Amino acid sequence: EYGALGYFVPRHSWSDNGKYMHDYYKDQPDKKLAATNEYVEFMDKIYGYIAKGLSATVYTQWTDVENEVNGLYTYDRKIIKLDKERVKSANMKCYQIPLAPAPSK
């Protein structure tokens, strides 16, 4: 499990006060760019684990929920919070990495 690249998007969250939400990119001028860059960095690390035998990962979480803004989409599902094409490209690289050989018996 990996992820939690959260930032607050006003008028698209469960609560607009953001009082209890962690906004990891609040000081970044371009939150979408900063979050996307970090996602790509996560994927760069995952590639190395695939070569060593990793077979699955789970991103947490797909959408923002009540008091958490860690989603790839906002709570109302109207805004994609990361650069869709860069995320797709990073994900597709997983299919190009040779899998580790199965352990011998």
Where in the sequence are the language-model features?
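Substrate-binding clefts and catalytic carboxylate motifs of secreted carbohydrate-active enzymes
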Residues: 1-105
